Regions:
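Bacterial N-terminal signal peptides that target proteins for export
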Residues: 2-14
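Sec-dependent signal peptide cleavage junction
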Residues: 20-33
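Structural signature of tandem-repeat unit edges
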Residues: 30, 35, 58-80, 91-104, ...
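Short N-terminal segments immediately surrounding and downstream of signal-peptide cleavage
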Residues: 33-43
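A short, structured beta-strand/loop element
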Residues: 48-58
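Signature of short aromatic-glycine-proline-rich micro-motifs recurring in repeat-based ectodomains
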Residues: 83-86
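Helix-loop-beta element that forms the nucleotide-linked donor phosphate-binding surface
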Residues: 349-355
Length: 363
């Protein structure tokens, strides 16, 4: 976004020098043109690339259409992509969404976010980025093939009705590539095209085709039980959910991805799988109502990122008799950690935990 603003200034200055002035009828310059609630960038830093479109933040239109071609000054400019305005909805513009939905600024808004009900994409348009806090958005329509660049991501869009996962959408590698992250959209129905080789939808949650990986939980339930056939819980799978109070994880689950249970505003209890070997980075970051954690004996490694004040743990029971390299420096000092032997106590000190540790041997 900053690149584009800088580019716009440079191009505009050059255009003014050449005598090309604004066209007030459509609010355009040589870098962009705004029409019908949409801003089209016609000149990109890659001269061979197609232009892209963004919403006009001041638009009060309830319906907008994203064109795949724009006529300007007698020339036709192709448009290939649409970018959601996620950068304007961050608590800290110098940060990112890498730690999950806690970075989303839910107090931020603009006219477009208050007004938009339906957005339609012309054939050939690829959607990029995260759609955040569109209060009236109900319909996302693709006239051609459904196409997303990096991730299918919608957050805090309470009236959103349907999201389609196209057959062309690839297998997730990490969050920024072929990820699915749809949270706080209580009215949404997620549909995976049958021909998609990587995904299926069960009870509105997204799984791998064979069901062994749970990618995205959209559930509005208060109590959530992970299915017995699940072997892996993906990165950010529950992150940002604001209805679930308790999670029960069967022993079939072998791995849990980074930040999977982070920013869950009502989560107060979780039962972990006895098959887990480690807890990934930031797995509970920002879930402040989670005060107690019972860690099964097979979990020997913690990758940290408890987040200082972003966690409110009071009691943690670690059942392993030997820990591997871990990080506890930012676990709250108000948390009392119960361990099985003095060896684990020494290891916790080595891993920078400064709070109270109690050795309590198993009876």
């Amino acid at each position: 976004m900053k690149k584009m603003k800088l580019l716009q200034g440079v191009i505009l200055g050059g255009c003014l020098f050449l005598g090309l002035f604004f066209l007030p009828s459509i609010g355009a310059n040589a870098a962009s043109v705004t029409m019908d609630g949409v801003r089209y960038w016609l000149i990109d830093w890659d001269s061979e690339a197609k232009g892209h479109a963004e919403l006009d933040p001041d638009s009060d239109l309830s319906e907008v259409y994203i064109r795949n071609e724009v006529e300007f000054l007698g020339k036709s400019y192709p448009v290939g992509s649409f970018w959601w305005d996620e950068d304007d909805f961050m608590v800290d513009s110098d940060d990112s969404f890498a730690e999950g939905w806690g970075q989303a600024d839910l107090k931020e808004t603009n006219t477009a976010h208050e007004s938009l009900r339906k957005i339609t994409f012309a054939p050939g348009i690829t959607v990029q980025g995260r759609a955040i806090s569109f209060k009236k958005l109900e319909e996302v329509v693709f006239e051609g093939e459904v196409s997303y660049m990096d991730e299918v991501s919608y957050f805090n869009c309470p009236k959103l009705k349907t999201i389609v996962l196209p057959s062309s959408y690839g297998e997730p590698v990490y969050r920024s590539e072929f990820a699915i992250d749809i949270k706080r959209c209580p009215s949404v129905q997620i549909v995976a095209e049958e021909s998609n080789p990587h995904f299926q939808v069960i009870d509105n949650d997204v799984y791998s085709k064979d069901g062994t990986i749970l990618y995205n939980v959209t559930s509005n339930a208060k109590k959530y039980e992970v299915e017995e056939f699940v072997r892996h819980i993906g990165e950010y799978a529950f992150n940002g959910n604001n209805t679930i109070r308790s999670v029960t994880m069967p022993d079939s689950v072998q791995t849990v991805g980074r930040y999977a249970f982070g920013e869950m505003k009502k989560l107060s209890s979780i039962r972990l799988s006895k098959s887990l070997r480690k807890l990934e980075e930031g797995v509970f970051l920002g879930s402040k109502k989670l005060k107690k954690l019972d860690v099964p004996k097979n979990i020997k490694r913690f990758d940290g990122d408890f987040g200082w004040k972003k966690n409110k743990f009071k009691k943690m029971i670690i059942r392993t008799k030997n820990m591997k390299k871990s990080s506890f420096y930012d676990l709250s000092k108000k948390c009392t950690v119960y361990v099985r032997n003095k060896k684990v106590k020494r290891q916790l000190r080595k891993f920078d935990f400064d709070g109270k540790i109690v050795v309590k041997k198993k009876k």
